[in-house]
C-alpha cells in the first residue's frame, strides 16, 4: 500500500520515483521485505519508510515554484521553509545550528525537548499556533485519523494507537 501510494502520488504531480532523494532500504515491515527477497525484487527509493515524506517535499517544491532537484539540501527553499515552520511552531531559533542528516537524507534540527513539546502541543491543539499553520494542522490531523496505516505502517505502534483512539489521540 505504501509503495503504490507513493508511486501514484508522484505520478499525480508529474514526477517519478527516480525523483526521490531519500535513498532506498528494505521495508521495515518484515513480511514485505521477505516477500520481496523471495520474489527477487530489490528495494528502491519508494520502499524507503520516508518516501511519503519525500513525496511531500517534492510536491511542496512544485506548488511553490521551486526546483525539485536537490530538495534535501539544507539551503534548498523547501528545507528552509521546513526550518521556518519548525522555528515558528516550536518557538526556537535554529539558524545558529548546523543540521544533522537523518537516515533518509534530510536536514534534521536539534532543539531542546521543551521546544519539541511546545510544537507538538501547538500542532495538536492549534492553540497558540501561527494562524497560517492552523488549516494545515487540521488537514494533517484528519488525514492521520482517517488513514492511520499511512502514518507508520501495518502493525506499528503509531498505527495501532491512531486506529484505537479514532481522533482522541494523535501520535507519530
Give names to the regions the model predicted.
Residues 31, 106, 163-165:
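Amphipathic alpha-helical surface "interface" segments used
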Residues 67-72, 125-131:
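Charged, low-complexity surface segments at secondary-structure and domain boundaries
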Residues 91-92, 118-129, 145-153:
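Short helix-capping and hinge/turn segments at secondary-structure transitions, especially at repeat
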Residues 58, 107-126, 136-141:
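Active-site-proximal alpha-helical segments within enzyme catalytic domains
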Residues 24, 41, 62, 103-105, ...:
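Solvent-exposed, flexible loop/coil residues
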Amino acid at each position: 500500500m505504501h509503495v503504490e501510494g507513493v508511486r501514484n502520488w508522484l505520478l499525480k504531480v508529474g514526477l517519478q520515483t527516480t525523483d526521490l532523494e531519500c535513498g532506498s532500504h528494505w521495508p521495515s515491515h518484515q513480511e514485505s521485505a521477505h516477500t520481496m527477497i523471495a520474489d527477487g525484487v530489490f528495494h528502491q527509493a519508494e520502499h524507503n519508510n520516508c518516501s511519503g515524506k519525500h513525496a511531500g517535499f517534492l510536491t511542496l517544491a512544485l506548488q511553490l515554484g521551486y526546483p525539485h532537484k536537490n530538495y534535501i539540501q539544507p539551503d534548498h527553499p523547501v528545507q528552509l521553509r521546513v526550518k521556518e515552520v519548525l522555528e515558528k511552531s516550536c518557538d526556537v531559533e535554529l539558524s545558529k545550528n548546523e543540521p544533522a542528516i537523518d537516515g533518509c537524507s534530510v536536514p534534521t534540527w536539534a532543539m531542546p525537548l521543551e521546544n519539541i513539546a511546545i510544537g507538538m502541543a501547538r500542532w495538536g491543539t492549534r492553540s497558540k499556533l501561527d494562524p497560517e499553520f492552523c488549516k494545515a494542522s487540521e488537514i494533517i490531523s484528519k488525514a492521520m485519523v482517517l488513514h492511520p496505516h499511512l502514518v507508520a505502517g501495518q502493525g506499528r505502534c503509531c498505527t495501532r494507537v491512531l486506529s484505537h483512539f479514532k481522533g482522541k489521540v494523535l501520535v507519530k
